[in-house]
Design a protein with these regions (language model features):
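Membrane-interfacial entry segments at the cytosolic side of transmembrane helices
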Residues: 53-62
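Residue-level marker of positions within ordered structural domains that often coincide
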Residues: 21, 35, 76, 167, ...
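Soluble catalytic domains of enzymes that build or remodel membrane lipids, polysaccharides, and related
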Residues: 98-99, 104-118, 124-246
Length: 246
């Protein structure tokens, strides 16, 4: 039972630490593990019920509270939570499809990604972590996507933007570091519609990247501030490095 109670203590710590407004990755780790912690709570509850003679009811109630705590948050990001969607009006533009992919810089399966583009045929596609190898390989796609903007980097923060629509205006932002870009791409369609695509890829808080979430949080806050200034229909897309379950 020592192991059982040790796991419970770990569950409690990982659940409570993110409630503190500390940007160190240790405090933010629990945010990324919410799904795991929810299932861990279920397993611990099940084990406790099976061994009810050894596990006090108060422990089971505590585990149930943590299960509800995590499940309530995750539920908002599932299909069970129906979000209100505005009906398409008569003067709406035609549908636009966008495909965004973090291709993982060290992945060399170029053809598999290109087949994905051929299959889905999006109007716009974006690659994140794309370096010079990916830029060269994806040139075969430029016949169908003549409008491009390329930020080729070898630090896993490269970005490449490909579009069937003309790029009316494009800005590169470096909100938190001079080697971590974000893109602000303005479109003006023939029907007269204006919209903006904002591509972001801030660094995550982790032992191997950033010791805290300051750069990630700063990047996302800077993007939010910029969105208020733009005051146009905007799509924010990319790898936000917040939590996988959202």
């Amino acid at each position: 039972m020592i192991l059982y109670y040790s796991i419970i203590v770990l569950l409690i710590k990982l659940s409570i630490l993110p409630l503190f407004k500390n940007q160190h990755w240790v405090f933010r780790l629990g945010d990324f593990l919410k799904v795991h912690l929810m299932y861990l709570a279920i397993i611990l509850i099940g084990f406790g019920i099976i061994n009810y003679e050894k596990v006090p009811v108060t422990i089971l109630l505590l585990l149930f509270i943590f299960f509800i705590f995590h499940a309530k948050t995750i539920l908002r990001y599932t299909t069970l939570n129906k979000l209100p969607v505005k009906n398409k009006s008569e003067d709406s533009s035609s549908n636009i499809t966008i495909l965004s992919a973090n291709i993982y810089q060290y992945n060399k399966d170029f053809q598999k990604f290109q087949n994905l583009i051929y299959k889905n045929n999006p109007d716009i596609f974006i690659t994140l972590e794309s370096n010079s190898d990916w830029e060269i390989s994806n040139r075969v796609l430029e016949n169908n996507y003549p409008f491009t903007h390329k930020v080729t980097l070898e630090n896993t923060y490269g970005m490449h933007f490909y579009s069937k629509f003309a790029l009316r205006d494009i800005k590169e932002h470096y909100f938190v570091a001079d080697d971590i870009p974000s893109l602000e791409v303005h479109f003006h369609l023939k029907e007269g519609y204006h919209f903006v695509v904002f591509v972001v890829h801030p660094p995550p808080p982790s032992p191997t990247e950033e010791v805290n979430s300051k750069e990630r949080d700063g990047e996302l806050l800077s993007v939010a501030k910029r969105l208020n200034e733009i005051n146009k229909p905007t799509i924010v897309i990319g790898d936000l490095n917040n939590v996988g379950w959202a």
